[in-house]
Amino acid sequence: MDLKERILAYMHEEAYRPLPAEELADGMQLTPEDLVQFDAALEELEKEGAIIKNRSDLYGIPSRMHLVVGRLSMTAKGFGFIIPDVRDSEEETDVFVPGADLNTAMHGDRVVARVTPAQEEGRSREGEIIRILERANEKIVGTFESSKTFGFVTPDNTKLSQDIFVPKKAFHGAKTGSKVVVEITKWPDRRRNAEGKVIEVLGKVGDPGVDVLSVMRQYDLSETFPEDVQEAADNVEQEPSPEEYRGRRDRRDLPIVTVDGEDSKDLDDGVFARRNPDGSFFLGVYIADVSWYVRENQPLDREARERGTSVYLVDRVIPMLPKELSNGICSLNAGVDRLAMACEMQISPEGEVTSYEIVPTVIHVYRRLTYNIVNKVLVDKAEPYLSDNQDIREMSAT
């Protein structure tokens, strides 16, 4: 157990009461080596919001001091709710914060609030923000307006209710009606709004493509990948080798199909179904085995976790993984072998799953279908779609 963990464990003891740093160190009976690191450990824990130092310089656990640490979620109406990092019970609600008690905190900030219990059952607790631990909006996308001596940016995100003041020297080419990215240089206080400088002009509001660029900048979406991530993707072979088939169930003989949008390039799941002689059904669902290529805590894995998901915009896709994987070896393209994880099920005539297996497989997708083709076959019964897919009509009847 490291020093920070020991400090927290000591503070969570039932008999603990808030103490100054010196008495806390004495009570823990720290060694000389621990004492060298003690102040830094306290500072880190305080920055993390795991402990609180009050106005009397006493250290304690937030929940025992009627405080809550969490992330502020604002509404367009000017009030917000704190989503606690930790809930001591399921009954603990989010904390309602009136606009007058925000104390310059902005949407997404990690904050500490002094809390009063809910006045009525079923209502949220109410709080006043007393400290901002971490600012969330260092860069903001919005519309620029200028005057002779200064400008301001109205954020696109309606949860950011205050305009950002921009000194004339920080316009950097922005004009009234420009969509811009502004970087905060001074955080707001009780008497003034936040101040910033324009770091990128995306174009004029309403111009083609500016709306998409605005979304990309607002959510920090990048079409390119860090060098180590791209290098890892470039080193992945684009065809599986026979050695990789060992230990996998060979399903290359099944006429598995994928069903996706017309323009989809990352085809990550396929399906096959048939009726058994006794009237029951076999159903196989095959998902690209991305984990075979994206190893835990390696560059590809870390980047994928950071991105969280692929993002589909009007005119482009921002992939979670480089295209060498998302559109290549991890895409279940027709006519090539691919590694997949499968859930293979036996289903009764009444539609109940009677058994299933989750197994690694190697597959060979028979055909790429689209939602339009499936609709033409199953609903419209239209030619030439019926004839073109006669060989898999039995599956659709299943």
Show which residues each predicted segment covers.
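Charge-lined substrate channels and their catalytic hotspots, especially those that engage the 3′ end
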Residues: 1-287, 291-336, 375, 396
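Conserved catalytic alpha/beta cores of large enzymes that bind or transform nucleotide phosphates
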Residues: 307-398
